[in-house]
Amino acid sequence: MISEENFQQHTPMMQQYLKLKAENPDTLLFYRMGDFYELFYDDAKKAAALLDISLTKRGQSAGQPIPMAGMPYHAVEGYLAKLVQLGESVAICEQIGDPATSKGPVERQIVRIVTPGTVSDEALLPERQDNLIAAVYQEKEKFGLATLDMTSGRFQLCEPADKETLRAELQRIVPVELLYCEEFNEMAAIEHCKGLRRRPIWEFELSTAITLLNRQFGTKDLRAFGVEKSPLGLSAAGCLLQYAKETQRTALPHIQSISLIQNQDCIQLDAATRRNLELTQNLSGGTENTLASVLDKCVTPMGSRLLKRWIHQPIRDVEKLKQRQQAIAEILNFDLVDELQPYLQLVGDMERILARVALRSARPRDLTRLRTALEQIPALRTIVQQKTPPFLTALFSQIADFSEQCDLLQRALIETPPLLIRDGGVIAEGYNTELDEWRMLSDGATQYLENLEKRERESTGIDTLKIGFNAVHGYYIQISQGQAHKAPIHYVRRQTLKNAERYIIPELKEYEDKVLKSKGAALALEKQLYDELFDLLLPHLGALQLASLALSELDVLVNLAERADTLNYVMPTFCDEVSVKIENGRHPVVEQVLKDPFIANPVELNHNRHLLIITGPNMGGKSTYMRQTALITLLAYIGSFVPADSARIGPIDRIFTRIGASDDLASGRSTFMVEMTEMANILHQATEQSLVLIDEIGRGTSTYDGLSLAWACAEWLAKKIRSLTLFATHYFELTALPEQLEGIVNIHLDALEHNNSIAFMHAVQDGAASKSYGLAVAALAGVPQSVIKLAKQKLTQLEKNSSHSADQQIQALREANHNQGELLFEQETDALREAIEKLDPDDLSPKQALAYLYQLKKMVG
């Protein structure tokens, strides 16, 4: 902090810097000085370390040199990209005054603040991933969450019912910045997020949020968007919009609506499920061997991003899913993949280009890419109209006629413009008469100078005379030192060099003034015309955004058709019964990485067969089998075809996985604690329509504790919840459950032992596995034979000395289960029956009856 006394000791320019920095204490300040952006004090030290640039000094503060670092203005994008990737925010301060007319320091102001969540520059963005900023608000135990994609204008909100749902939503959207209220008290739910930004409570004020949103959308109320009954979500949305305006320092016309995400409209996936199924990120944090890596061959970046949103948010609207299936079938039936994809590829990232147009930050090549995109629409429309597939025809009805806008860009811009408008050469010849005249004047300089040079050589007799130009002295006549004595008297010396003299004559000076004026006028007019292009395009922004969304969807559907054809996928069917029936299903990722043919397997889950106990050896394929069931179900619910011979799937509300676990050292949780936390979430949240995958529950504790927990969890899922469950276990005792409870079935993945080797068959068969094959797998892993031999001896000894035979252990569990079952499932009913039998309604007053009703409610939990 600079004291007032030290502040006054600084130069006016540094005082200006310090005032601007005080307004933006938490961001790096890029301060424009001529052709450089400079940073000072701690900003300079931080930037030098992060960007590997030189740290120098300038002037003094309190007797100490001021640290300084900087970079050329024309190279700033590369430095910004690196800082944004590191999670930093940067305030860009530009010179807006004219140095020639300024008294004191040139006027400067911050024109934008670049943050990880609000960037729109192409160089700063991951091409095939959404770049979202979010805000979260809390009131008691309820939450509001809003998300904004600055690169498309997509603005959404939801109200997670609890912190687990909030955590799952954040895992789905993966925001690069998350704004949270200073009074937020569930930090454990958000601490894993990047770019946490603490904001004051008043930014979440509901009435302010509603006013801001109505002003943004030009509406009187928010009923048209269906969000008026979501106050917590609106509070978060208001803070988010305010932050976006604060950082962009300009209008945001591409943000034209807001929508409400309803949890009941989508299949819910918690954070553990997204991680375990490796949808878009593998367990190592990379993108290889994920569902998206197999499924995403979209030819446009915006299509790729839309597909990933579909994967992370499968929908439950069967009619909409059937429309997607119909579209994929149409594309395949009419052989449209090869016809449509070349044109779609040229559409490119129209969505993000339009965002930059809205922010008036689009560069010349953005506009030429938009022109190219618009040029593809008639060809795409013609292909669809010729084949007349119903769904695709309806999709194209959302795309307006943009022939006028396309013609405008064709007339206005040259074929391949420079990167920036700064130096001109962007507007095409013939677009503006005045610009052509100024250009003709400046471009005619070459011929004029050649004629003047020839004339002066002849009149002076100096054959080495030549005319040149530099930025400092302008035009000049140059004569070598050996012939300088021949220079006419009207030649005025302008510069002396070691081997030559440079002169100026009135005629050349007059022409110089005219040329420089024409170049300046041409550049100023060109910049004006370029800005006017935005004015001409912005009235059509909404229609252009609808078109880009439709083209994104078309790209995804064509991609899914290509994947279905290439990978031999089939169209699944939907039914009303809560069930999953898959014939010869395959894991979509594993089958692509295996060198050997993938062994396809069936699965059938329904009312009479709702929990499968899966046994078999490690490496036998149990986890793959369970994951492929979940992935095939998920693919069906995004509208995709699936890797199977056939699939018939009923209503699913959630998918849960409890597969694998590791220590969460950062939170101080053991493997067993992580496992139990995930299991508790399933037992609390799962319903009869949930698909539940559980792999090896109870491994992280003693054998009897683990077996007891596994048995109790399986029984609870089968008897209380009745969800569709795949339950893999090494506890052979659990295979006795089908004899006691309806709806439980044993299946296993088999293996063959020969001599000391083992062969995994990877085929699912009915019944329980005959043995665990643990020692054979250990030998396969390379455990020394002497250790294997010792293990066999110990195994024989343990089996011989066991206090109970396997049958006796199972019988003991059955008896315990019977007694415990009474305690868990019947005791509640008996106590309730007894309480009701004791009740005499005629003896109760209304107040006593109400109190008794509350007591009965408490008894049932």
Curated annotation (Swiss-Prot):
GO terms (BP aspect): mismatch repair
Binding sites annotated in the UniProt record for ATP: G616, P617, N618, M619, G620, G621, K622, S623
Keywords: ATP-binding, DNA damage, DNA repair, DNA-binding, Nucleotide-binding
Keyword DNA repair: yes
GO cellular component terms, semicolon-separated: cytosol
Task performed by this protein: This protein is involved in the repair of mismatches in DNA. It is possible that it carries out the mismatch recognition step. This protein has a weak ATPase activity.
This protein's name: DNA mismatch repair protein MutS
